[in-house]
Amino acid sequence: MLQETRTANTVAMPAAAPDYHHIRRAIAFLTERWQDQPSLELLAAHLGLGPTHTQKLFTRWCGLSPKEFVQAITIDHARGMLEGASSLLATAHEVGLSGSSRLHDLFVTHEAMTPGDYKRRGEGLEIAYGFHASPFGEALVMATVRGVAGLAFVDEDKGQTRAEALADMTRRWPAARYVETPAQTAVHAARIFEPAQWRVEQPVRLVLIGSDFEVRVWETLLKIPMGRAVSYGDIARHLGAQSASRAVGTAVGRNPISFVVPCHRVLRGDGNLGGYHWGLTRKRALIGWECGRVRQS
């Protein structure tokens, strides 16, 4: 059930948000032409910008030059991100989500709804939602009184509309009541997308709504630090279900809280990107942006 209650958004958009239109086009171009190693001048011409403007665009958006960004999304770099993944998950289990190695990452706390709540498919649940600018395109943020329940992106590469992005999320919990209150969700959006607001004393609160197995997979995703990656098989082994890589892949694909629950940090075992519900261009953007964050920290 949808109900509109529009109120003003008084929270400033993330500083990098206006740049994503150009960044998205640049990533698509670089992905198609990477074997040719296109020059800065060629990339700038494709974007309709000058070389200096293009260089500053990338530096402002992620702290990397275009050349460094391309290196961050290569398969060789991805394989490096996967090194030691099994021990990484084990170590993360010991130190939790606020260890010193995660000081450049978003801080979160989470709780999971009971299996009974999940089976009711959102019945009796009110979910506020709003659309907000982000460094990765327009984001749909959804929250209950207990915390953020959903975060999606409007997929420009597929020509997706806001209504289609909303429908993609509401079908997960069809019995819930949905109220458009962007002033409420803007606070969550700012804490998620503005690194200056990433503080251990003010973590983003999440509520995970899924099956027991899905929640276990999503909790494992929360253990992957920024700048690192694991494979679907690594997650299956960590959960003691070595033969369940396919089921893990399905659960990763059903993650309703993108970016915060970092399903983009899951790759195939050979370093290939695999899939991403909100498009591979955006997955590359997330990986490259996070590489820049790690280098700056």
Question: Model features per residue range: what roles?
Answer:
Residues 243-285:
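Short glycine/serine-rich loop segments
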Residues 1-95, 101-243, 291-297:
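Basic nucleic-acid-binding alpha-helical/helix-turn surface characteristic of O6-alkylguanine DNA
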Residues 142, 275, 288:
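Short beta-strand-to-turn element immediately C-terminal to the catalytic PLP-Schiff-base lysine
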Residues 279-297:
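Short, basic/aromatic-enriched C-terminal tail that caps enzymatic domains
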